[in-house]
Every structure is written in C-alpha cells, then in structure tokens.
A protein has these predicted regions:
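Single conserved hydrophobic/aromatic residue that forms the stacking wall/gate
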Residues: 1-9, 14
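Short alpha-helical segments and helix-capping/turn motifs at coil-helix boundaries
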Residues: 6, 48-49, 156, 241
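N-terminal low-complexity or amphipathic/hydrophobic leaders
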Residues: 15-36
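Conserved alpha/beta core surface patches that mediate binding of polyanionic ligands
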Residues: 36-52
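Long, contiguous amphipathic alpha-helices that act as assembly "spine/axial" helices in icosahedral shell
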Residues: 51-110, 171, 256-258
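Solvent-exposed alpha-helices and their adjacent loops that cap or buttress functional pockets
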Residues: 56, 163-165
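Charge-rich, acidic-biased intrinsically disordered regions
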Residues: 105-124
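Sequence/fold signature of self-assembling virion shell proteins
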Residues: 119-158, 165-170, 176-278
C-alpha cells in the first residue's frame, strides 16, 4: 500500500520546536477604546492572561529486522525496499490518526486550554461572556446547518467580548459526506428543492477554501470548519523523523528503525467549529 497522503497541516499550523513541551498563553487584549473628553486624562486598560495551552511532545518509533539468512539468499534488496516503505506508512498512519484525534474526541474528552472541550457552547471569556463553536443542537451536514455555522462563527468575540468578524475557511468532512459537501459548495442553485433560488453558500463564497476529506475521522456524520482565527489547531515538531540501521552481532540480523517526536493541540478553540451530527 502507498504511504497516506499528507493531511496533517490541512487544518493546523506546523511549527518546529526545541523544548520538551510547549506552552502558549492566550491574552485578553483590551476593551473598546472610549471617547476622551477635551482636556480629560486618557483612559488606560490592562491586558490579562486568559488561559494557557500546553503541548507535550510524544516519541513515536518503530523498527524491523531482516535475518542473516534472508540476506544470504539474496532477499535483502527486495525485502529492504518493501519493509522500508511499510515502515514509512506505519509512521505516517500514526501521525494522521493523532492529528484527527483532536477532532474525533473534541466533543467528549479532548479539552482546550480554557478547560472546556474543544467544541463547546461555553468557551468563557475573561470579560464574562462566552463563545460557542458548535451548534446549540447537534445537526447533520446540510444547507441549514452549514449556513448556521457561518452565522455562529461570525458571532465569535475576543476575550473582552469584542466582535472579531471571524469567517470560515475550509470544510472538513469524512468520506461519507464528500458528495453532500460537493453539492452544498459547488452547485449554482440550492440543492433538494424545486425553487430556482441561488446557492447562497456558493454565491457568497462563504467557505472560500472549499472542502477536504479526512479519511481518519471516526464519525461518519460529523463535520468541521476551520476559521480565520489565528493560533487554532497546531502541530509542533520536536524531532523530525530520523531513520537508522545497524547489524546485530549475535544474530547477524540487520535492524532498521524510524523515530520522531511531535505533539498536536489547540491554542485557540475558535480556530475550529464542529458538529457531531445527529
């Protein structure tokens, strides 16, 4: 089988790092600037720390060996090439699964730095408000739910409850929804109706980067949107994949291994929007 296509990075920032872990602090910024009366003193505001997102790097490693007898029987070249490709595929698969795990567990067990699950109706702000990056009621992917997602994202505020005019960027769907996504985003007229209405999602360019299929999503009716809010989902690379080989004196086998260190996480949950479906 071929090495999986590179999906890591389609919905997250990728950064190289040199520490055992990473921490990113979200700052509150300032409130709305007030009007200053003539001759009056200027008003001052204090920025605050909202929450801290922590990324703990994991080491992922795997290896294989070729026996001395296989090398004697001139099987080394064919086996080495095939096993090396299989090892690369195994390493890539683990990375894709770990990246998708943020989405797969984002409604249940994976928490963002503010203590709420990644997709929550209660991402509280330091000013006392809250943001919701999931629908109030679980919804399947259709015209109504996608339009509501665009509206919900537009209502995002910063930590001081100021509107940030957020917009969706890309729709992420499992294979089971790829055809639904095509009809919703790439047709000129509305789908599933005899009315001659335009497809507002398409005409308005509401999802400017279209959609991508993520084969590692485990829920067949969940869908997700990336937004233009910076510092959302991130992938930190502590050590890029390294390969090495050596011979074992006792057995005569030749051993190969691959190893890398990385982490996945979310610095700002407003970088994503998701619905688990019904």
């Amino acid at each position: 089988y071929e090495v999986p296509l590179r999906l890591v990075g389609s919905e997250m920032c990728i950064r190289d790092r040199e520490r055992s872990f990473e921490e990113e602090v979200k700052l509150s910024g300032f409130g709305a600037a007030p009007v200053k009366a003539e001759g009056a003193s200027i008003s001052y505001d204090n920025a605050q720390e909202s929450f801290t997102a922590r990324y703990n790097h994991e080491t992922v490693a795997m290896g294989f060996s070729i026996t001395e007898e296989a090398m004697e029987d001139n099987l080394y070249d064919s086996l080495s090439a095939r096993y090396t490709k299989a090892l690369a595929r195994a390493m890539a698969y683990t990375k894709q699964v770990k990246a998708a795990s943020l989405l797969n567990t984002g409604f249940t067990t994976f928490n963002s730095g503010d203590g709420a699950t990644l997709f929550s109706t209660a991402h509280n702000t330091v000013q006392g408000g809250s943001n919701s990056n999931r629908p109030a009621a679980n919804a399947d992917l259709n015209e109504t739910s996608l339009e509501q997602a665009v509206i919900d994202i537009a209502a995002f505020t910063d930590e001081r409850d100021l509107l940030i005019a957020a917009r969706p960027r890309k729709l992420i769907v499992p294979p089971a929804l790829m055809f639904v996504a095509t009809r919703l985003l790439q047709t000129d007229l509305r789908v599933g109706t005899a009315d001659n209405d335009i497809n507002a999602l398409n005409t308005n360019g509401s999802i400017p980067e279209g959609y991508v299929v993520n084969h590692y999503l485990t829920d067949a009716d969940a869908f997700f949107l990336t937004t233009d809010v910076p510092n959302g989902m991130k992938h930190f690379v502590r050590t890029a994949m390294q390969t090495s080989m050596d011979g074992d004196f006792d057995t005569g086998n030749v051993r190969y291994k691959a190893r890398e260190r990385y982490s996945f996480g979310v610095s700002d949950p407003l970088g994503m929007y998701g619905s688990p479906g019904v």
